[in-house]
Amino acid sequence: MEHLLAGLNRAQHEAVTATEGYVRVIAGAGSGKTRALSHRFAYLVNELGILPGNILCVTFTNKSANEMRQRIHALTGDNDTGYINTFHGFCVSVLQGDSHAVQYPKSFLVLDNSDIDAMLGIIYEERGLTLRDMTYSAARDMIEIRKLFKEPEYYKDMITMSLDTLREKYERADTAGDIIFYGYLYQEKKCFGLDYNDLIKFSLYIFEQHEDIRLKWQQRLEYIMIDEFQDIDALQYELMEVLCGYHGNLFIVGDPDQTIYTWRGANVKYLLDFDKVFPNVQTIMMMENYRSTPEILAAANSLIAKNGHRIKKDLLPTKPSGEKVVCHFADTQEAEAQWMAGEMQRLHDRGVPLRDMTVLYRAHYVTRAVEEALMHEKIPYTIYSGVQFFDRMEIKDALSYLRMIAYQDDLSFRRIANAPKRNLGKRRMAFLQETAEKEGTSLYVTLKNHLEDSVFSGTKAKQFVDLIERFSHSYQGRPISEVLSDILDKSGYEKALRTEGSQERLDDLAELKQSIYEYETSCGEESTMEHYLAHIALFSNGDVAEQGDKVKLMTVHAAKGLEFPYVFLCGMNEGIFPSRKVRTLPGMEEERRLAFVALTRAEKGLYLSEADGWNFDGSPRYPSRFLLDIDRELLSFTHEVDETLLREAADDVARRDKYLREDDGDGTLPIGQRVRHAVFGEGTVLDVDLNKGAHVIQFDGMGTPRSISLRAKLEKIGP
């Protein structure tokens, strides 16, 4: 026993040895909760003699589950590590054992997004739907919303209805929403497929309808432990209630200050109200932080204290003092990135490995300037959970349009001739390739010379050639940023992204345009198209080594649960972090919790930065409210603070706050929602502009989007 309890602090010791009944652990960031969970599992097995197969330990990611298994195996020496899994993974075990109860085979399919999109493709083709009716992304969201909220009993149709009856229901559907929803249920049943929502719903159905199966699992699971309880949703909570109903041994761990997934249905009230729901709950506060210096924790505590709806608690430092949190105000994104690269180089010169440095950000599009600065300084880096800026599909497509205008080369032609779709598929491209080789011409020239051939009838080949010809004869002397905006509009490329609902890709294109504008400003007369394309090739040749000592770049969401010696949190501006898409006060508190998560990833050094300049919509960019939230004496500023800038930033925050609602209500509409306006007719919501207090709507009968006040009356069409 001694080796399992050795080195544990008082709270950890209490958590490990409190084995019976209902136990809630409020565990702050870096407080050693994973250590407590793994040692508790080992304590149950090694000291109490509980069989591993009678313990359920739930984590929220497969990666966490694998790491937990490894830790427990090292402590117990037993290859049987019980049910250490995600909720969905556990439900797969239930269904594989008792799938006969829902008339499904043991070999059912677990569907991912690509499977769902393939099913949507079949439905759209069968019923003549297009992406104008609903994008795949919007369709997936609609299906999930209907399954969770609007038609939560849907699974009974899947289980009890015959395939023919489901097919008839699908065929009778006459609105896009119903066609897609019932078509999807039919396709699921047809291939015995279950998505993530189905896994829990089907398991709950089995437990509800078959007492013998429910009792079997309840009796088997003598001890249940759940990590990251602040991220649990209603279905997972219901499943947990069922499973612990026999033995009553439930151990939960969570931190209300790290609730960052409410957009996925997480509800922190399950953690906060745990002692009101279950009897004789023992609550353990695990606040000693073993990760960060006192200076980093002081800044994080100061930030999160500004949230009103929380358990008032502070992380307690255990590490010796370090340096103050550094805060840098830059004039431009480029200057911010150059400062970061310089600080990294200074750290590296002091002997800090590059792999100990991590750049965190709220959204991927802010990495462009950072990547350029790192490459310029020859600092190798790698992006986690994302693609390097100049390797992203939409950036490569946009640059290929510019190359087509300037060079009309085959590589660019292959990339964008059918982007957006012009019906120039594999067969016609093969014809072009073969003909080009015979005639000794480029693919583009070959297409120009053969536009009248029957093989190109029914395509938009002529429109494409006309587009390239028009731009190639007129681009010289025009600003490159203007040419790019123009061709992305005239080609229909940006419109196609809007139709798909690809807001992140549109943000990336806006960032590219901004970077070109800044390039033009800095280069003056040298800023020709050819010069720019040669310059940008240096940033997109992928010549950074894949292995070795590299800086890590990742979103804050991707960094959850991780820790890094030195953290650079960039893009700390209103509209970036917090996101411009936040519409409610609870949503703003979640953004602040996300910032808290970012700050508490740092072990030794934390660098916060923002950049002045202009937002995509032309409005001035101000420092984030989260920088203003932190007590100034806790920060080390790199230069004298501009008090006027901070006053203007505070005024900007106050102005934005006027548009934040108390709850989620119906004040704004989701992106992709179809609406009807009394004068303009039907259209699609493209975005919500909180700066203007408006929906951005593309009306069907208009060539360009319109900003419509949030207060204007709009009728929702469909789900």
Give short role names for the model-derived ranges.
Residues M1-K106, V110, C191, L215, ...:
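P-loop NTPase Walker
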Residues A6-T17, G21-I26, A36, L56, ...:
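Conserved helicase NTPase motor core
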Residues A18-T19, R24, N79-G82, H100-D198, ...:
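ATP-hydrolysis module of ASCE/P-loop NTPase motor domains
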Residues V25, S31-L37, P279-Q282, M287-P380, ...:
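Helicase P-loop NTPase motor core
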Residues S31, Q230-H309, K313-T318, E437, ...:
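Conserved helicase motor core of SF1/SF2 NTP-dependent helicases
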Residues F90-S99, D257-T262, R291, Y384-A406:
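Short alpha-helix plus adjacent loop in nuclease-associated cores
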Residues Y170, P353, T367-I379, R392, ...:
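Conserved helicase C-terminal RecA-like lobe
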Residues G571-T704, L710-P719:
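C-terminal accessory regions
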